[in-house]
């Protein structure tokens, strides 16, 4: 679709979508250059922090009372890969159809919120409005690969982050297919568990007892029985009080490995019972579950002789933000949305975002993407966002963020 007379904010959004920050080789230098150029154009003070190994772009609008706790608008600039053959258009072309639907990797997760935060900052600076509290923006890398190493997980433990003096963080949420908007106050802890079984070997023609695969299968069956219990719990209530995905523990068998390879090829010896078998599980645990008790459950599942486990991903702590009248940030956020006739639905985020690193420091964090009446397409083929929904999202943030920053 021709971009003549296109809204300038939509044009900026589409330009950012075209930058290839997809894994495994995200072009962070180009995204950093883009953000720095916009900060200069919008007269927003900025710096590029590189101590974690990959550029983190920080912007700041200083408040009249800089000693007060500040508000952080956090967004990640990286996106997941896209299978080009499964898209109807180039996933990095930011193509827009006649209905105003913009197709591209990152339209929902989360380059939309990146640019909406930036536009809010631009409007605040342009208006000359004086803020009570300082407003920070952070554009971070590597969220899509867990935020570890060079992303938010490392950044939160730096002196630079401590100096930001954060009182509240706003981060990404999810699209809502209904007229409601979803706000997330916690998320499930991602545990990736690798189980190894060791047992007796022998010829495939015999009934060998105590084999590795037998031991592993017994454990797998126990864990899949637990999975079925959680599945039934999720789908038990179909009324308004029914559980959401973030309320239950999901468990999926994602890795299976066994067999004796022949000459390091893809062929295996079918007549040899292997001495070792392995399985990997992706487990997502809601913050309402005691993690120490769940760890004991895994130990019980793997208690049989010859079984052991280790974590490929492990989070020992998983805090959530309280949504009660004692939380002044929440009361302000909720009241701001009420004034705009926005109906909020509160949930636990079913996957993981950088917010978990913030919450685990004891800092309140809300996951909120102002996207409604839109199918949830993060990480999916043909991910899109309508330009009208995008522009309304900027207005929604303008109705929320200044109120938070000017809060007593």
Curated annotation (Swiss-Prot):
Gene: acy1
Subcellular location: Cytoplasm
Residues binding Zn(2+) 2: 109, 144, 379
Name under which the protein is recorded: Aminoacylase-1
Disulfide bonds: none
Species of the source: Dictyostelium discoideum (Social amoeba)
Binding site for Zn(2+) 1: 76, 109, 172
UniProt keywords, alphabetically: Cytoplasm, Hydrolase, Metal-binding, Zinc
Catalytic activity: an N-acyl-L-amino acid + H2O = an L-alpha-amino acid + a carboxylate; an N-acetyl-L-cysteine-S-conjugate + H2O = an S-substituted L-cysteine + acetate
Subunit structure: Homodimer.
Keyword Zinc part of the UniProt annotation: yes
